[in-house]
Amino acid sequence: RIIMAESMAGLKRTHRCTEVTAAQIGENVTVMGWVQKSRNKGGIIFTDLRDRTGIIQIIFEESDCGAESFAKAERLRSEFTIAVTGVVEKRSGAANENLKTGSIEVRAKSLRILSESEVPPFPIEENSKTREEVRLKYRYLDLRRPDLQRNILVRSRVATMVRQFLADEGFLEIETPTLIKSTPEGARDYLVPSRVHPGNFYA
């Protein structure tokens, strides 16, 4: 279940998570995505923000983001959808070699919770060991996992390349009706009433 929270009015993303690099240190950026995990260390909150490109670390301190945003940051849980505006900094301590953004972090100046989420039925992470029937039941969550997102990206790129090649060769893309036969033990036919022949249906 998703609960809509704050509005996106007047808000515009400047970068996707892994588009933020060391070249932007000192600059203000606005990033959006899902909370992968959030850790409250007492006075400072570390949040891993994830979008389809990867993960970036966000730091919340009340002295930087204000009492209101810090109070909201204390509520963050896995799969909350948030928007953060802040300043890019070199990561304090050792860099995380496992992340593309492992050498930097964003010190939050403001936070908007775009939607809240209940505890997900399985962790949204690569190589999930969750049973397939559970993943299929919550397919909209399963499609957020990095390995499936890569598959979607590859499919999109291949389809775009094929379409562009055919367009360059002078082909037209025309959406025609698809006629298929009924299959034994298949799904029930979807009946569409005919307006020209009352009482008859297309299947």
Label the model's feature ranges.
Residues 1-4:
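Short, Lys/Arg-enriched N-terminal segments with co-localized hydrophobic residues
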Residues 6-203:
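Class II aminoacyl-tRNA synthetase-like tRNA-binding/catalytic domains
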